[in-house]
Design a protein with these regions (language model features):
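Long, C-terminal-biased catalytic regions of enzyme "large/alpha" subunits
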Residues: 2-177
Length: 177
């Protein structure tokens, strides 16, 4: 995510950056729940789903409303979530994808239930992604454009963020080599 925002020339804490992050999170979570519903069709819903069906579907509908950018009309929520900021998302395809996948997740979930009660977690950053050619490893911005990874056998491995040249070009900087 950090590399995507950098390559797009968007500030991590800009309205546009937050909107892209929210759209990506909505797509990932909606896809995971749609897949969970497909699994429930084949393997059955999670234990306890029948008892919690109404509450689970209400949660899913509220997730869909947030993914659609709804400011109100949430079901049985005292505090409304921060909805996807549709107006500030510079990529309308992400918005449309989020809307479609949440519609699909609800449709499938109403028919088959869900195999999983929870489908996503955002883990802390790790360094494995850096040696797999990922310029950023988590949801936060890159902590350094040049990093040194200590090797178990001794020595260091230099890792350079390869997104910087694209980000500078996107922001209008000229290559003066």
């Amino acid at each position: 995510l950090g590399a995507l925002l950098m390559a797009s020339g968007l500030g991590y804490d800009s309205a546009e950056g937050r909107a892209i992050a929210a759209a990506v999170a909505a797509i990932m979570t909606g896809t995971a729940y749609a897949t969970s519903a497909e699994m429930a069709k084949l393997m059955g819903a999670f234990p306890g789903y029948a008892k919690n069906r109404d509450a689970m579907l209400r949660v899913m509908r509220n997730h869909r409303r947030a993914a659609q950018g709804a400011g109100s009309d949430y079901e049985k929520l005292a505090i409304h979530p921060v909805a996807l900021d549709v107006a500030n998302c510079p990529d309308s395809a992400l918005i449309e994808a989020a809307r479609r996948i949440w519609d699909r997740a609800i449709e499938l979930g109403e028919k088959h239930g869900f195999r999983n009660a929870q489908v996503s977690v955002i883990a802390p950053t790790g360094t494995i992604g850096l040696v797999m050619d990922c310029d950023t490893t988590g949801i936060e911005p890159d902590f350094a454009l040049v990093k040194f990874k200590k090797l178990a056998g001794g020595g260091y491995f230099k890792i350079i963020n390869q997104t910087v040249p694209l980000a500078l070009k996107t922001l209008g900087y000229k290559d003066e080599t």
